Amino acid sequence: MPENVDQSMQQFIQKAAVLIEALPYIREFEGKTVVIKYGGAAMTHPRLRRSTMEDVVLMKYVGMNPVIVHGGGPAINKRLEQLGVKPQFQRGLRVTDDETINVVEMVLCGTINKEIVSLINSAGGTAVGISGKDGNLLHAKKIKVEDGSDLGWVGDIVRVHFKIIKVICDAGMIPVIAPLATDPEGNTWNINADTAAGEIAAALQAEKLVFLTDTPGILRDPSDPRSLIRNVAYREIM
């Protein structure tokens, strides 16, 4: 038997074994919504990107409703630096002036969102790319910082109008959401992707919220990986 055929057979057997083991979980989550915050190495490494989207498509095939909310920090930083703008952060949030919000929207909606949609479609699924501005999905107001700092167009979500997500899922498709929001005046707000994923999951009453990220966990200081909080009670988070 040719070596490549033998390898393909081994991969098939391994995947079949995984599916058999996963059957109880597949039945448990059939028809349930799972929100996935997509970031970290899974977003930048080509092989991981492809395998992650294959897993998302499989989730849809077995009856789950995956909803992807993606970040894009490194790509935004790269584009800003190409334009001669130094990225600035305060307490883990991007300082977003008029020029930066335009770059954020361009990179998130014009590049990253479309790439994810393409990967899902190539893996056999059907994805629809939207931002939080579409269908009035996410409404936000200016975020308030304890020390009074002005972060520019950084928003705090005040409402999630999730009908557009339901429409996409019910049509057998996978929504891919860029974390931007709008307000009654039509302004564009930059939303932290983790926050957006959490708010969307809560509004959808999702069964699970999954974070794909390089961050080791909840950090006391978002800029310091050594500040990992290893144990925390629910009331302390709230």
Residue ranges and their predicted role:
Residues 1-238:
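Nucleotide/pyrophosphate-binding catalytic subdomain
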